[in-house]
C-alpha cells in the first residue's frame, strides 16, 4: 500500500485540516468553506501585517520605542512617577548623613603648620591652629604606663600615636601618686634585664653597695630613703670584721665565729654558711633548721634605718652543747 494514499486517508478523517492537492494547492474537505478560522487573509501574509499584530511591548523591545505614560484602569488612582537613576540620592551627596570620626580636629595639620595654607580648606580633617584643636576622648590609662617596645628595642613603630609613655614629659598620671618603680635589683646591684625609666630626682643619691640587696628584693618607697651618705658607706677606718671578744674553746668554735658584722647597717648581719660549721652531721642538721643554708644578707631591722651600735653576736645553741660536752 502506498504511503501517500495512507496519508491522504488520515487527513480525510479530520474536517478542519485542508487536504493538499497534487498540484501544490489546498482543497477543503466537503462541507467546509474555503475560509476557515486557520485560513490566512492576503493582508496577513504580508510582513507589515505581521508587525501590526504584535503587541506594543514587543514593538518597544524590538524597535526601541519608549513606552509613554499609560493611564491607570478605571477606579484606580494614578501611580507616582518612578525616580530615575539621575534623581535618586547618592550616598556621597552632601544631604546624606555622615558620621564624624573620633579623631576629627584632634591633631594639627602639618601642611598648614609648615606653609600656612592647606588645599583642603574647611574640609580638612586636621586642626588649622590651636583654636580648632579639640581634646580627644582617650582611655583613662592613656600615657600612664611605659612603652615596652621603646625601652627594650629603643624604638616604637607607632611613634607619637603610641598610647604608652616614651618620655617622662608624657606621663599623664594623676598628681599625688608617685610612679611605682617596677625594677628588681639583682645581687650585683645592677638593674635586671629590662630597662625602666630613670628614677625621680628625689631618689638620686650615693650608689648602693653591691651586697645591700638580695636577688629578689625591690626598692622601698621613696619616703623611706634617707639621703645621708653615712647610711650607705662605712668610714674609711672602720674595720669590716669584728671578732667575738670571748675566748674560743675549740677549733670548731673558732671556725664558726661570725664572719663579719656590717658596721653602718646594723640590721644587716651576714650569717655563717653551712660549709663553715665543720663536718659533723649534727652541726649540719641544726644549722639547716636554723639558717637554711643561706649565705645572703638577712634583713632583721630596717635596711635604711639610721646607724645603731653593734651588739655582740650571739652563739648558736649547737656551740653551747659542744662547749658543755668538752
From Swiss-Prot:
Main location: nucleus
Residues that bear Phosphoserine: 60, 66, 88, 90, 93, 169, 186, 197, 218, 228, 276, 296, 323
Higher taxonomy: Eukaryota, Metazoa, Chordata, Craniata, Vertebrata
Subunit comment: Associates with cytoplasmic CCR4-NOT and PAN2-PAN3 deadenylase complexes to trigger ARE-containing mRNA deadenylation and decay processes. Part of a mRNA decay activation complex at least composed of poly(A)-specific exoribonucleases CNOT6, EXOSC2 and XRN1 and mRNA-decapping enzymes DCP1A and DCP2. Associates with the RNA exosome complex.
Spans annotated as Disordered: 13-66, 78-102, 175-245, 273-292
Name this polypeptide is given: mRNA decay activator protein ZFP36
Keyword Chaperone: no
P-P-P-P-G repeats: 71-75, 198-202, 219-223
Amino acid at each position: 500500500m502506498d504511503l501517500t494514499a495512507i496519508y491522504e486517508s488520515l487527513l480525510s478523517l479530520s474536517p478542519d485540516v485542508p487536504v493538499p492537492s497534487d498540484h501544490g494547492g489546498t482543497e477543503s474537505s466537503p462541507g467546509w468553506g474555503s475560509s476557515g478560522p486557520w485560513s490566512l487573509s492576503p493582508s496577513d501574509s504580508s510582513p507589515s501585517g505581521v508587525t501590526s499584530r504584535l503587541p506594543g511591548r514587543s514593538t518597544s523591545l524590538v524597535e526601541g520605542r519608549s513606552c509613554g505614560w499609560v493611564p491607570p484602569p478605571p477606579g484606580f488612582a494614578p501611580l507616582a512617577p518612578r525616580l530615575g537613576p539621575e534623581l535618586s540620592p547618592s550616598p556621597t551627596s552632601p544631604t546624606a548623613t555622615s558620621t564624624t570620626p573620633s579623631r576629627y580636629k584632634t591633631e594639627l595639620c602639618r601642611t598648614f603648620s609648615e606653609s600656612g595654607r592647606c588645599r583642603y580648606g574647611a574640609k580638612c580633617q586636621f586642626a588649622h591652629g590651636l583654636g580648632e584643636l579639640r581634646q580627644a576622648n582617650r582611655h583613662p590609662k592613656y600615657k600612664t604606663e611605659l612603652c615596652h617596645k621603646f625601652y627594650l628595642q629603643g624604638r616604637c613603630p607607632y611613634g607619637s600615636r603610641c598610647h604608652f609613655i616614651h618620655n617622662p614629659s608624657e606621663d599623664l598620671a594623676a598628681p599625688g601618686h608617685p610612679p611605682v618603680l617596677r625594677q628588681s635589683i639583682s645581687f650585683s646591684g645592677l638593674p635586671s634585664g629590662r630597662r625602666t625609666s630613670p628614677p625621680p630626682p628625689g631618689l638620686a643619691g650615693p650608689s648602693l653597695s653591691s651586697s645591700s640587696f638580695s636577688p629578689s628584693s625591690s626598692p622601698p618607697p621613696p619616703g623611706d630613703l634617707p639621703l645621708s651618705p653615712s647610711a650607705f658607706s662605712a668610714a674609711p677606718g672602720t674595720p669590716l670584721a669584728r671578732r667575738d671578744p670571748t675566748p674560743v674553746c675549740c677549733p670548731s668554735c673558732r671556725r664558726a665565729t661570725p664572719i663579719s658584722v656590717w658596721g653602718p647597717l646594723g640590721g644587716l648581719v651576714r650569717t655563717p654558711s653551712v660549709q663553715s660549721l665543720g663536718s659533723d652531721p649534727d652541726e649540719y642538721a641544726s644549722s639547716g633548721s636554723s639558717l637554711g643554708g643561706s649565705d645572703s644578707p638577712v634583713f632583721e631591722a630596717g635596711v635604711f634605718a639610721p646607724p645603731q651600735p653593734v651588739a655582740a653576736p650571739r652563739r648558736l645553741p649547737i656551740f653551747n652543747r659542744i662547749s658543755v660536752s668538752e
